[in-house]
Amino acid sequence: MTGQVRLSFDGPIATITNDNAEKHNAFDDAMDEALFDILGELRRHPEVRAVIWRGEGKSFSSGRDVGSIGVVKVSLSHHELMRRAHRGIQQLWELDAPVIVACKGWVMGGSFQRALLCDIRVAAEGTRFRLPELNYGVIPDTGGVGVLYEMCGPGVVSDLVLTGRVMDAEEALGHGIVSRIVPEAELDATVHEIAQQIAGAPAVAVKMARAVIRHLAVPQLRSAMADEMIYQTFVNRSDDIAEMRAASVEQREPHYTGS
C-alpha cells in the first residue's frame, strides 16, 4: 500500500498525519507532493490557529524511503528537484499558524530536518533522532543543519552529520531540539493541549510573535538551503557518488578520491 499524508480539521486546529506506518512513515515522492499540497491548502485556511504534525504507528518518520533513493519519476534535473522540494517545505514559514511536531520512534533524515523548521517539537520517551545521509552518499539538504547549528553549535552538528549517530530524546531536550519529553501514551494529548492553548490566544498576537521569531531565523535558513542546493548538486554529479553506486552493483569495496 502506498503511503499517504492526511489533513484533518478540529475547529481551529489542523492535523497533518504521516501515514506509511509499515515503513515507519518513510517518505517517497508521492508523499512529498501530498505534504506540499497540504501546506499550500493550509495557507488558504486563515481560521486555523495551530497545526499538529504527527505520524501513525511507531514513528514520526524515518526520513526518505530508501527504496526510492535514486529513482527519478519526473523529467527534472537534480537541481530542479531540490528547488521544488525547498519551495514546498518553505511554505511552513508562510503559515500564520504555529506548527507543533509530535516526535516519536524514529525521526530521521529529511523528516528530522523538516521537524526542525517547525515551531515546537515535543518528544515521546524513547524517541531517536538521526541524520544518516552520508551513509547514502549525499548530504542533509532540507535546512535543518542550519537550525541545529544555532541550537547545538558546530561540534555537535558535525558529530551528528559526519557519523550519523543516534541522538536520544534526553540529549535532544538538553540542546533545545525538543522542549518537552512525555510518555508516548501522552504524546498526542500533550501536543493537542499545546495547540488548544495557542489557538485560544489572540490570533494577531500569535501571528506577530511568530513573525518576530521567524525574522530572526529565516534569513540564515534561506542561506543554508541555498548552499545545500549547490553542494548537493555537486555531490550528485561527483566521481565518488558514481563509484559508490558502481561498488554497490559490483559488490565490492568502494575507492573514493574526494572528487
What are these regions (language model features)?
Residues I16, N20, L35, W53, ...:
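Terminal peptide-recognition signature
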Residues G40, E47, G55-Q91, V107, ...:
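Glycine- (often His-adjacent) and acidic-residue-rich active-site loop
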Residues M1-D19, K23, R165-A199, K207-L216, ...:
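Amphipathic alpha-helical segments at domain termini/boundaries
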Residues Q90-V204, M229, R237-S238, A242-E243:
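Crotonase-fold acyl-CoA enzyme core
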Residues P12-I13, K58, T127, I230:
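Beta-strand-connecting loop/turn residues
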Residues M1-E56, Q90:
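Conserved CoA-thioester-binding segment of acyl-CoA-metabolizing enzymes
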